[in-house]
Design a protein with these regions (language model features):
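Short catalytic helix/loop segments, enriched in acidic residues and glycine
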Residues: 46
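Conserved Rossmann-like nucleotide-binding pocket used by diverse enzymes
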Residues: 18, 65, 181
Length: 222
């Protein structure tokens, strides 16, 4: 749990709750301890609710992150409990299971949606067959829902090059995405220890200029 952040829900003071478990094995994952279904640092839900009760006058929102939170069967009920306390509800997801994502989406005020790559390149990142189809199907659900969102792509320059990143942005724009963020990978801790550390190459004004023309809202994060 992160008790206070201004980064994980735009414009909101938020608490982030990290849900255990993920079905993908993204090579640059910087939270590999959250992949297993059970973890060593689990917090009882009652303790979380007590913490939130004490922060009702300080926090605006609670973000459910992971791992992949939509794999948790109890997520929708937990989201409703948080909303009943007066908080806005954020969700970080890659839409791993489209049905589970669609169910959780109905309980969210805002979604930070991860798009790893072009559909055809997904397995290079996630190491899971069919992951691209699932992700983009969930993206369609998100865009049709009317729920506020940000789509974001984590860039590791050994897994995606500038031409593919631009093609990804163009495909997102053609799909109806209005808000897109590119964020450089965190290399301090990665699931694939053999993956080379890629410099955070950000001095690409032509590429970022093209993306700013594609989207009404574009953000570049180091």
């Amino acid at each position: 749990m992160v008790p206070l952040t201004t980064l994980d829900y735009p414009g909101m003071l938020a608490c982030v709750l990290f849900c255990q478990g993920c079905a993908w094995r993204c090579r640059y994952c910087h939270n590999p301890d959250l992949i297993a279904p059970r973890g060593s640092a689990e917090i009882d839900w009652r303790r979380v609710l007590l913490f939130l009760q004490r922060r009702q006058d300080l926090l605006d929102a609670v973000v459910f992150s992971g791992g992949e939170p939509t794999l948790q069967e109890g997520l929708p009920a937990a989201m409703d409990e948080v909303r009943a306390m007066g908080f806005r509800v954020g969700l970080h997801s890659a839409g791993i299971k489209p049905a589970g994502f669609a169910n959780a989406l109905r309980h969210a005020d805002w979604v930070g949606f991860d798009v790893k790559a072009l559909v055809e390149d997904y397995q290079l990142v996630t190491q899971v067959k069919g992951s691209g189809v699932a992700n983009w199907r969930s993206l369609e659900t998100l865009l049709a829902s009317g729920v506020d969102y940000e789509c974001r792509t984590t860039v590791h320059w050994h897994l995606i090059d500038t031409s593919r990143l631009l093609r990804l942005a163009q495909r997102l724009q053609a799909s109806g995405v209005k808000r897109f963020a590119v964020q450089m990978v965190r290399t301090a801790s990665m699931l694939d220890e053999q993956l080379p550390i890629a410099p955070a190459q950000m001095a690409l004004p032509e590429l970022w200029g093209c993306m700013r023309e594609l989207f009404p809202a574009f953000v570049l994060r180091g």
